[in-house]
């Protein structure tokens, strides 16, 4: 059933493999959702061999990086998107929302836009201004709204609102892969170069930017947990969702999942039960304005701080983490100060009211392309809020 207003018809969804989206989440988000989704894989080149990401996994990328072999990536061709669009048209879709990694990080959006001119049906291409499960949650929101019978405009806006609400932060062993790939400049690379300091980064308005510095992976887990709970408390109305990304550090990822799931209270999912997924991802591996026209739109961009914004309530054990993260406020070797005061304020703001997740925190494996750019040792946390379709 098409809702009033906008462009009617069955709406398909296309994304790319940087979403790192576990297949189990797609299958569980709405009845028959998988039939409405196509994933266009980016291409990975290891040495002189190029393969689509769904044919060359993240483990191969990690091995190549460990051996010092050059790894590069490239966008899907417009022809790959045309094929995906037409496959959905053959499945009965009359319009498509094509949701992709930030234009500032990848030219995938440009490829999708070129393909939309040849597809022969209505395609709305959306720059998510993010990547990873922040993009993946946008895809899940789009699938839910499509399955609820909403038109392409409402489906696209649900995806935009989810991605705009998202907050992504991650720890990396080294900034060198990001520097080589042009995702962070030389000045940014210096952020993690002094002594044994390890960088925490964030996706801020579509680009990768420094967030904090820690001295060990263990401290990174604690900092990411405090940060994620504080961000989730300020996301606004809707279903709060959370994901943890990793490849090589699965044990640390589980610690972070447990911290988020234990320091919070997983709420009931759409089927009345808390849900989680730990699996390889599909494909291998701006915000919206207010809309006063009624329930056919998912709502405005969620209020709340960006990753470096004002503190919010954190989990009940956050106060114990102050000593571990407060050292970030001490002068660093380059004379600047870290964000220890802010971290301590976040921890001190802990309250007895726990964050409630719409589903249990998801553990999502990094895909090959994301691994190529952040390194196999990356560990990330993503929080977002998904608007629920009315009715």
Model-derived segments and their meaning:
Residues 47-120:
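Class I S-adenosyl-L-methionine
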Residues 3-12, 17-45, 108-124, 130-278, ...:
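Mixed-charge interfacial surface used for oligomerization/domain docking
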Residues 75-76, 127-129:
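Short beta->alpha junction loops
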Residues 1-2, 8, 78-82:
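M14 metallocarboxypeptidase catalytic domain recognition
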């Amino acid at each position: 059933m098409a809702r009033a207003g906008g462009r009617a018809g069955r709406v398909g969804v296309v994304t790319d493999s940087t979403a790192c989206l576990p297949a189990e989440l797609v299958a569980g988000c709405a009845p028959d959702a998988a039939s409405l989704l196509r994933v266009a894989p980016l291409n990975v080149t290891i040495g002189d061999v190029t393969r689509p990401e769904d044919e060359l996994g993240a483990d191969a990328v990690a091995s190549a990086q460990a051996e010092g072999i050059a790894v590069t990536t490239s966008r899907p061709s417009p022809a790959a998107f045309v094929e995906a669009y037409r496959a959905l048209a053959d499945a009965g879709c009359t319009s498509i929302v094509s949701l992709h990694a930030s234009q500032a990080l990848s030219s995938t959006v440009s490829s999708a836009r070129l393909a939309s001119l040849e597809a022969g049906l209505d395609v709305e291409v959306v720059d998510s201004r993010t990547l990873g499960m922040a993009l993946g949650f946008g895809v899940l929101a789009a699938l839910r709204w499509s399955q609820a019978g909403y038109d392409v405009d409402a489906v696209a806006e649900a995806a935009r609102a989810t991605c705009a609400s998202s907050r992504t932060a991650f720890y990396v062993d080294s900034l060198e892969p990001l520097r080589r790939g042009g995702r962070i400049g030389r000045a940014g690379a210096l952020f993690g170069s002094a002594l044994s300091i390890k960088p925490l980064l964030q996706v801020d308005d579509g680009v990768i930017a420094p967030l904090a510095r820690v001295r060990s992976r263990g401290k990174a887990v604690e900092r990411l947990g405090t940060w994620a709970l504080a961000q989730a408390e300020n996301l606004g109305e809707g279903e709060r969702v959370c994901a943890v990304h990793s490849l090589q550090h699965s044990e640390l990822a589980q610690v972070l999942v447990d911290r988020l799931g234990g320091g919070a209270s997983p709420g009931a999912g759409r089927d009345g039960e808390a849900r989680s997924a730990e699996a390889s991802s599909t494909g291998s591996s701006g915000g919206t304005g207010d809309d006063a026209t009624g329930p056919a739109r998912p709502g405005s961009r969620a209020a709340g701080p960006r990753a470096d914004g004002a503190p919010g309530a954190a989990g009940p054990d956050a106060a114990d983490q102050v000593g571990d993260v407060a050292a970030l406020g001490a002068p660093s070797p380059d004379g600047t100060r870290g964000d220890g005061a802010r971290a301590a304020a976040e921890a001190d703001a802990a309250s007895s009211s726990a964050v409630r997740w719409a589903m249990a925190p998801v553990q999502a494996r990094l895909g090959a392309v994301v691994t190529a750019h952040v390194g196999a040792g990356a560990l990330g946390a993503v929080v977002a809020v998904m608007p629920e379709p009315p009715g």
